């Protein structure tokens, strides 16, 4: 008796779930603005993610904060590369290079220690990260004025 009631309850729940899936899919397909709203939502999430990355940048006028940020980014980048997460590791290394006082020397060291494909990935990401840091710094200066 109990097993039969459980089976009926499971069947009803399964039917309700499938019905909801069909309803949602039909609603999604018939909405002409669904794709536009989805694109806008993804764009907002991407912008929020970029802003979150910029918000953790130190004040470039504070040498101690820059040094701490530099060391943290180098350490985190090395750890992520060791774990095989090359994209994230390269992102952190490019952040460190962008705030480094002597980026050419750091690039030479990284060229000797990193595998060539990872170093090429680093070189391709470096201009965009540097540009974001420059724009973030100019935004911070605009906020002060």
UniProtKB/Swiss-Prot annotation:
InterPro entries documented for this protein: MAS20, MAS20_rcpt_metazoan, Tom20_dom_sf
Chief location bin: mitochondrion
GO cellular component, one term: TOM complex
Localisation per UniProt entry: Mitochondrion outer membrane
Pfam families per UniProt: MAS20
Keyword Phosphoprotein in annotation: yes
Keywords assigned by UniProt, alphabetized: Isopeptide bond, Membrane, Mitochondrion, Mitochondrion outer membrane, Phosphoprotein, Protein transport, Transmembrane, Transmembrane helix, Transport, Ubl conjugation
Crosslinked positions (Glycyl lysine isopeptide (Lys-Gly) (interchain with G-Cter in ubiquitin)): 35, 56, 61, 68
Transmembrane segments: 7-24
Topology versus the membrane: Single-pass membrane protein
GO biological process, one term: protein insertion into mitochondrial outer membrane
Post-translational events: Ubiquitinated by PRKN during mitophagy, leading to its degradation and enhancement of mitophagy. Deubiquitinated by USP30.
Residues found modified as Phosphoserine: 135, 138
Annotated GO MF terms: mitochondrion targeting sequence binding; protein-transporting ATPase activity; unfolded protein binding
Chain ranges on the Cytoplasmic side, renumbered to this chain: 25-145
Sequence ranges on the Mitochondrial intermembrane membrane side: 1-6
Purpose of the protein: Central component of the receptor complex responsible for the recognition and translocation of cytosolically synthesized mitochondrial preproteins. Together with TOM22 functions as the transit peptide receptor at the surface of the mitochondrion outer membrane and facilitates the movement of preproteins into the TOM40 translocation pore. Required for the translocation across the mitochondrial outer membrane of cytochrome P450 monooxygenases.
Subunit-level organization: Forms part of the preprotein translocase complex of the outer mitochondrial membrane (TOM complex) which consists of at least 7 different proteins (TOMM5, TOMM6, TOMM7, TOMM20, TOMM22, TOMM40 and TOMM70). Interacts with TOM22. Interacts with APEX1. Interacts with TBC1D21. Upon mitochondrial depolarization, interacts with PINK1; the interaction is required for PINK1-TOM-TIM23 supercomplex formation which is critical for PINK1 stabilization at the outer mitochondrial membrane, kinase activation and downstream mitophagy.
Record-stated family: Belongs to the Tom20 family.
Protein name: Mitochondrial import receptor subunit TOM20 homolog
